[in-house]
Amino acid sequence: MSGHSKFKNIQHRKGAQDKKKSKVFTKLIREIVTAVKTGASNVPENNPRLRKALNAARSQNLPKERIDKAINSANDASNTESYTEIRYEGYAPNGIAIIIEALTDNKNRTASEVRSSFTKYGGILGETGSVNYLFNHCGVIQYPINIASNEDIFEAAIEAGGNDIISNDFAHTIYTDIENFYKALGFLTDKYGIPEDSYIGWIPVNTIIIDDKEKAKKLLKLIEVLEENDDVQRVFGNYMLSEDVYEIIQEE
């Protein structure tokens, strides 16, 4: 397990915290509904995916009444609302590999919108499996840096069954096998509380450093448009902004 990353965690991912709450809540509710419908129980202790979804909802301050409504809706036999999990893969400008995970009630609509976004911003939407070999599929659990010392979080990650941990100036990020993700998440949640973020995702094997401001802005625009789509849950890419470019963009 590695203790510290060589670079600051400066990969620019405009996540849920940068979106309007309505869009954040839409994505969270979809995940709750899907977790209930695909799980064996609507009791979080017996449904790890639901527990994770509820943790995410609470960390984003989704009102309790909306959480309860989503769970009740998913349990209503007369409610035919359902979402299909689907993955899209392609290349953004300058050869950046992109993986998109979506929950959709209309695959044709989502595919059309994702393809349109790629085309508009200079990317190419490929077939499923066209870029995933450039990533590791694993669990990710992130805590703020002040939750524990590097040594303590390192030991906790090992005990939880984590494979790797990276600590930088801002966060501790623990990586797990997919099979061990929910067990590790439960252990760490019991020890440190709800994490800032947790998910099964795609982590690049190698990253492409972007040190040109205009190239970075073009890429980030595509990422932003994709993440604004209600059907898109997460976007992953094998890129990292150089510190200089990151700071310039942050100042604009």
UniProtKB/Swiss-Prot annotation:
Pfam family, one: Transcrip_reg
Keywords: Cytoplasm, DNA-binding, Transcription, Transcription regulation
Any one Gene Ontology cellular component term annotated for this protein: cytoplasm
One BP term from GO: regulation of DNA-templated transcription
InterPro entries: Integrase-like_N, TACO1_YebC-like_2nd/3rd_dom, TACO1_YebC_N, Transcrip_reg_TACO1-like, Transcrip_reg_TACO1-like_dom3, YebC-like
SUPFAM superfamilies in the record: YebC-like (SSF75625)
Protein known as: Probable transcriptional regulatory protein RT0442
